[in-house]
Every structure is written in structure tokens, then in C-alpha cells.
């Protein structure tokens, strides 16, 4: 415990012009969420913050709209003019005055881990100022860390202001620091903009404080991946690749077999049982729970769903906000839409769409069917081409099918309608009324045959010789 009040301050006022986007840089997506959302979540997971605040400028309204649902308690501070990172922090002076420590971070550092931020805050609580650094093989574009003879940080020199010797330094400023209130309030007003950019650099705070004899602790990351930011699309893709590899390692730790670890995308949280096998080009979104022994074949997309043990999801199937039971068989090319529950042993075959339906135990919808707003009992066979006609142009209506029902191919069930236990529906029927239990229902017209029928013949075309 710190026994101190802590403000988490995120600087998100920059335009990010190199992204060539109509959105601010902070809203560029990593792992299905804006970069800034990853950082805010990591800050919260430290369990050390009293409040969070975001300094915004460019397209601030869009930033607030994107984050307000997941981060409703964040304070918003507007930077009226884009005068640099030092000026951005100065904009939050009223909030800084209310907290013992302020944790400051740039919005485009989505891979920082909560444990790293915890360590930085504890160091700042002890020394008054702690700054996060990393060793980079290619430090181009980053501010370089300068140490004094005591080992403390005495300056940060930005790339555009660095001399040749300083540019050879590989230890860089990550863009995360924690500073006690007294020093921020004392030294922020002393920042100057005598640099190549004509801006007030937050990094200049280091030299001002060190010059007065204060020790500034540097905390160097074990993995430089946490320090990665993104100023353009190529760097954004590199961030996504590191994020994906983190998620892959989480799956390995759960005992999942990935046929090709480089060809999976995970945008969310995956909770997997033992002996799960995932083939290439699978996309997992939101919260996905996968039981023991499940196989997910290539090309599938699963979002916010639960898959029971020993189920197989065949190739190119899409499952969205649904629950699949144990030992089920789904696909290939099946689409399972929200509010669908498929019981144990259910079989949903190729080119079948299920929406807001309950499919009973060991029931089968094998081919080329649409089942919407329906409740199907146990051990039902739904023939190829069966459609539940659930929409009348104004409202949706339900279809109820009992246990042990057999529905022939190319059948239309016009809702609202009920097919009771044990009934059989003849192929090609259009069912508009309820069907009693253990009966055969069919609406097939009588077969008509015309003898000696000849199909119309095409007329031969004669070429014009002229």
C-alpha cells in the first residue's frame, strides 16, 4: 500500500498526423480496443490510483464518446493550445493539487503492464520522482536518458535536440513518470520552450529538478516491448503483433495447441480448458470460454461465446454471443447469431444460420436452413432448406418444435406456429397452422404429368452473308 492519493494522468491531446487518420492517435486500435483504453485499464489494475484524468485536445469529443462507457469516472481536462507535453500536464494543475503523487503517461503506450506501473509508483513514493526507461536497439525518435555520477537521471534529451554523442545512447524515455505533488507544482511553471519544436517539453522537468540536487530514480523495463508506441501505421502493426504474441503465450499457458501461432487473432479474453486445438486463421473476440477437448478449425470467428467440451467447430463458421453445449458439431460455414443456445450433442451443418433460437439435445439442422426466433426440442431432425418464416414485415414471431419431430426438406414454417412432439412434416410443405403430436402434416400439391410434352426449342440464327 502507498498510503498516498494518486492521480493517473494520460496525455492524449496530440494529433498523430503521421497516422493519416481522421481519428486521434489515442483511438487507433490495438487488439480490438483503442490504445488509450489499454493504458487506462492497466492503470486501474494497479489498484493504487485514486482518480484518473485525460488531457485532450484534437477531436476530444470523439475521444470522450469512445471511452465514456468503459471509463465513466475519468476526469477530462482540455488543453486549449497544442503547446507541448509540459503544457498538457500544466492544464491539469487543479487535479494535481488534490493528490500526493501523479502518474503521467502518453496515450499511445498500450502494452505497459500493471505490475510495471505499481513498481514505478512505489519508487516515486520513496524518491519523489521515478521515470520509466527502456534499452532500445534502435532508439531513433525517442528522448535519450542522461545519468549523473550518482546514477540518478539528470536530463532527457529529445531526438531533434540531441547531439551525436547523445544519439548513441540506447536508454530511452518511455513516456511514463510518477512525480510528487510539490515538485510538479514548483517546477512546471519554470518550463521553457527554447527547443527545435518551440514546445514546452515535460521531459525538461527532469533537468530542472535534478539541477536543484534532487535524486530522480530510473526504472528500466526488462522487456522493451512494454515501451512500444505508435506514430504511424507500420508501428501500429508492430504493436498489434506484440499484443498477439502475448495472447498466444496466455493460450499456451492454458494448454492450448495452436497449429500456427502466427496465424491467430485474439481481441479480448480467452478462457480455455485442456487439450484445445485451434487451427490457423481463427479470430477470437470479446470473452470466449472454450471447454476441454474442443477443436476449432481454420477460418472461424468466435465472439463472446461459450463452447462446451469435446465440441468441434468446423471451418469458416461464425459464432456470435451464443452458447454451444458439449459434444456438439458446428459447421462448416455455419452462422450462429446472438441469443442462440445449442444443447449437448447438437449438430448444425453447412450453410445454416441460427438466430435467437434454442436447439435441443442431439437435434440436427444439417444443411442450408434458417432457424430464427425458435425453440426446438430434443432429437429433432430439420431437413435441408427448412426456413422459419419469423418476420411478417412488422414484427418477429416464434416457432416451437417439440421433441422427436422430423421436418422434411424444403419446408417453410410460417410463424407463429407450433409443431408438437413426434410430428412429421412432409418435404416441400408450407406450414401455417399448428401441427398435432404424432401426426403427418404435408401441404404438397398433387403431381400433374402431361404426356408427350416437348420443351420449347431455340430458333436457329442465320448469319447474314452480305
Swiss-Prot record:
It is found in: Cytoplasm. Residues 255-466 are annotated as: N-acetyltransferase. Keywords: Acyltransferase, Cell shape, Cell wall biogenesis/degradation, Cytoplasm, Magnesium, Metal-binding, Multifunctional enzyme, Nucleotidyltransferase, Peptidoglycan synthesis, Repeat, Transferase. Its cofactor is Mg(2+). GO terms for cellular component: cytoplasm; membrane. InterPro entries: Bifunctional_GlmU, GlmU-like, GlmU_C_LbH, Hexapep, MobA-like_NTP_Trfase, Nucleotide-diphossugar_trans, Trimer_LpxA-like_sf. It is an enzyme of class 2 (transferase). The active site is at residue 367. It holds the Pfam family Hexapep. Mg(2+) binds at residues 108, 231. Its main location: cytoplasm. Its EC number is 2.7.7.23, 2.3.1.157. Residues 1-233 are annotated as: Pyrophosphorylase. CDD domains: GT2_GlmU_N_bac, LbH_GlmU_C. It catalyses: alpha-D-glucosamine 1-phosphate + acetyl-CoA = N-acetyl-alpha-D-glucosamine 1-phosphate + CoA + H(+); N-acetyl-alpha-D-glucosamine 1-phosphate + UTP + H(+) = UDP-N-acetyl-alpha-D-glucosamine + diphosphate. One of its GO terms (molecular function) is magnesium ion binding. Catalyzes the last two sequential reactions in the de novo biosynthetic pathway for UDP-N-acetylglucosamine (UDP-GlcNAc). The C-terminal domain catalyzes the transfer of acetyl group from acetyl coenzyme A to glucosamine-1-phosphate (GlcN-1-P) to produce N-acetylglucosamine-1-phosphate (GlcNAc-1-P), which is converted into UDP-GlcNAc by the transfer of uridine 5-monophosphate (from uridine 5-triphosphate), a reaction catalyzed by the N-terminal domain. Homotrimer. PANTHER family: BIFUNCTIONAL PROTEIN GLMU, NUCLEOTIDYL TRANSFERASE. NCBIfam families: glmU (TIGR01173). This is Bifunctional protein GlmU. The lineage of its organism: Bacteria, Pseudomonadati, Pseudomonadota, Gammaproteobacteria, Cardiobacteriales.
Amino acid at each position: 500500500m502507498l498510503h498516498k492519493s494518486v492521480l493517473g494522468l494520460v496525455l492524449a491531446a496530440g494529433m498523430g498526423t503521421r497516422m493519416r487518420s481522421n481519428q486521434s492517435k489515442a483511438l487507433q486500435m490495438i487488439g480490438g480496443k483503442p490504445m488509450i483504453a489499454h493504458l487506462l485499464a492497466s492503470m486501474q489494475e494497479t489498484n493504487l490510483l485514486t482518480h484518473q484524468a485525460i488531457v485532450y485536445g484534437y477531436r476530444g469529443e470523439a475521444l470522450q464518446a469512445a471511452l465514456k462507457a468503459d471509463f465513466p469516472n475519468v476526469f477530462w481536462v482540455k488543453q486549449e493550445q497544442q503547446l507541448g507535453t509540459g503544457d498538457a500536464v500544466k492544464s491539469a494543475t487543479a487535479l494535481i493539487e488534490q493528490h500526493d503523487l501523479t502518474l503521467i503517461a502518453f496515450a499511445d503506450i498500450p502494452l505497459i503492464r500493471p505490475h510495471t506501473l505499481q513498481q514505478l509508483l512505489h519508487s516515486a513514493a520513496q524518491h519523489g520522482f521515478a521515470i520509466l526507461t527502456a534499452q532500445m536497439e534502435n532508439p531513433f525518435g525517442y528522448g535519450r536518458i542522461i545519468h549523473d555520477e550518482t546514477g540518478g537521471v539528470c536530463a532527457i534529451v529529445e531526438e531533434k535536440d540531441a547531439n551525436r554523442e547523445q544519439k548513441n545512447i540506447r536508454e530511452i524515455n518511455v513516456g511514463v513518470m510518477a512525480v510528487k505533488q510539490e515538485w510538479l507544482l514548483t517546477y512546471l511553471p519554470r518550463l521553457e520552450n527554447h527547443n527545435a519544436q518551440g514546445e514546452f517539453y515535460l521531459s525538461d522537468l527532469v533537468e530542472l529538478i535534478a539541477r536543484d540536487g534532487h535524486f530522480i530514480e530510473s526504472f528500466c523495463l526488462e522487456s522493451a516491448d512494454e515501451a512500444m508506441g505508435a506514430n504511424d501505421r507500420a508501428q501500429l502493426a508492430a504493436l498489434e503483433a506484440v499484443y498477439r504474441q502475448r495472447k498466444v503465450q496466455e493460450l499456451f499457458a492454458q494448454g492450448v495447441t495452436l497449429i500456427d501461432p502466427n496465424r491467430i487473432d485474439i481481441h479480448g479474453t480467452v478462457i480455455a480448458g485442456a487439450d484445445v486445438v485451434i487451427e490457423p486463421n481463427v479470430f477470437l473476440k470479446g470473452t470466449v470460454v472454450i471447454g476441454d477437448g474442443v477443436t476449432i478449425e481454420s477460418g472461424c470467428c468466435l465472439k463472446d461465446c461459450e463452447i462446451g467440451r469435446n465440441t468441434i467447430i468446423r471451418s469458416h463458421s461464425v459464432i456470435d454471443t451464443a452458447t454451444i453445449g458439449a459434444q456438439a458439431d458446428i459447421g462448416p460455414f455455419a452462422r450462429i447469431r446472438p441469443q442462440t443456445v445449442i444443447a449437448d450433442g447438437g449438430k448444425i451443418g453447412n450453410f445454416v444460420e441460427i438466430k435467437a433460437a434454442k436447439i435441443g439435445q442431439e437435434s440436427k439442422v444439417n444443411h442450408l436452413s434458417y432457424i430464427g426466433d425458435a425453440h426446438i426440442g430434443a432429437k429433432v431432425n430439420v431437413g435441408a432448406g427448412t426456413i422459419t418464416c419469423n418476420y411478417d414485415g412488422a414484427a418477429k414471431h416464434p416457432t416451437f418444435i417439440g421433441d422427436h419431430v422430423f421436418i422434411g426438406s424444403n419446408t417453410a414454417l410460417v410463424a407463429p406456429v407450433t409443431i408438437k412432439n413426434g410430428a412429421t412434416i412432409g418435404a416441400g410443405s408450407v406450414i401455417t397452422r399448428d401441427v398435432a403430436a404424432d401426426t403427418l402434416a404435408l401441404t404438397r400439391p398433387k403431381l400433374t404429368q402431361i404426356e408427350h410434352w416437348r420443351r420449347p426449342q431455340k430458333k436457329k440464327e442465320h448469319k447474314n452473308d452480305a
